[in-house]
Amino acid sequence: MTSTNTRNKGKCIVEGPPPTLSRYESQKSRDWNTFCQYLMTKMPPVHVWECESNHILDFLQSRDQFGKTKVHIQGCVFFGQKEPPGECNCPLKQAWGSLDALIGRLRAAYEENGGLTEKNPFARGGIRIFLREVRGSQAKARGVLYKKKKRLVVVGTGTSTTWT
């Protein structure tokens, strides 16, 4: 493989094949393209710079069809059990961690594609609340307890600390 370097207005440009993307960068690009295509299927089509929280929430819920995590419904005999002893007909959904990672990649891709940080729809409070609710409901359904992290509070001049 040969490549040549040329000068262009003080910037060195390497000609040749594009660099290989990392797994994260490839996934981020795929996620961005999938989201943009999803918006174009809306009636009327929505441009990515016009999308709102409701479009993102609809997209996240549409991802459940590809989920692999069994989430027991309230009336299921296995609801709240970590390791249920049998099978049930409860739905498969996207795991909270997968949705959280997806939002992180889309948040980064939005800004890398020219979106303003302060207008990033993937960083809005409604999206964070949705993810928190999914995390809580999936944890409850699967018998997993998440403990809130305790905050360190510095009292006085910093010589003593207390945990709350």
UniProtKB/Swiss-Prot annotation:
Keywords: Developmental protein, DNA-binding, Nucleus, Transcription, Transcription regulation. GO terms for biological process: mRNA transcription; post-embryonic plant morphogenesis. It is found in: Nucleus. GO terms for cellular component: nucleus. The keyword Nucleus applies. A motif (Nuclear localization signal) lies at residues 148-152. The keyword Transcription regulation applies. One of its GO terms (molecular function) is DNA binding. PROSITE patterns: ALOG. Signal peptide: none annotated. Coiled coil: none annotated. InterPro entries: ALOG, ALOG_dom. Residues 23-150 form the ALOG domain. Probable transcription regulator that acts as a developmental regulator by promoting cell growth in response to light. Belongs to the plant homeotic and developmental regulators ALOG protein family. This is Protein LIGHT-DEPENDENT SHORT HYPOCOTYLS 8. It comes from Arabidopsis thaliana.
